[in-house]
A protein has these predicted regions:
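Terminal peptide-recognition signature
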Residues: 4, 35, 47, 105, ...
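Short catalytic-loop micro-motif centered on adjacent basic/acidic residues
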Residues: 33-36, 56-59, 116-119
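Residues in well-ordered alpha-helical elements
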Residues: 20, 45, 73, 125-128
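C-terminal capping/lid region of NAD(P)-dependent oxidoreductase domains
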Residues: 29, 113-120, 128-155
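Adenosine-nucleotide cofactor-binding segment
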Residues: 1-43
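Glycine-rich phosphate-binding loop and adjacent beta-alpha segment
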Residues: 42-113, 147-155
Length: 155
């Protein structure tokens, strides 16, 4: 929760059963404008229930597994909500898009508008452990794989 508040969140909700109810209780049963769901299968239904009518659910990950295919009428049932599944390939498919978007990210970092919260660092030789920690949700923020150790030696 601390990381979320430090990043500017007004309110933090822990995902799981009852998440949509917590969200709606917090904002007078209106739902939220946008839900960014990086968990996937385990949270998708709650994400649909937490968003306001005509709101957007952006499904950008599948940490708990892929979301099952859905009937489009489900979006209507929840108030004509919009569902998107953005991917880097779709946003960089046209010539020059990757460079333009990469340049925008670098500029945002240089301007201080985009910051990284590196919470763990692993030598490259421990990449499998880093991957396990990600899968087991033992990490928050960003992790770094080091190609060289502090002495400049390659791992």
């Amino acid at each position: 929760e601390e990381l979320s508040y430090a990043a500017g969140a007004d309110k933090v909700f822990r995902y799981g059963e009852g998440l949509a109810e917590q969200v709606r209780r917090y904002n007078s049963d209106k739902g939220v404008d946008v839900v960014y769901d990086g968990v996937g299968k385990a949270t998708f239904q709650e994400s649909l229930e937490a968003v306001r009518p005509r709101g957007t659910v952006a499904l950008f990950g599948a940490a708990s597994g892929p979301v099952e295919p859905i009937d489009p009428q489900l979006l209507n049932k929840h108030g004509s909500i919009f569902l998107t599944r953005p991917s880097i390939g779709a946003w960089t498919a046209q010539e020059g898009e990757f460079q333009m978007r990469a340049q925008a990210v670098v500029q945002a970092v240089m301007d201080g508008d985009l910051r990284f919260n590196v919470t763990a660092s692993y030598p490259l030789a421990e990449a499998a452990a880093a991957h396990r920690d990600l899968q087991d949700r033992k990490t928050t923020g960003s992790i770094v794989l080091r190609v060289q150790d502090a002495d400049g030696d390659e791992d």
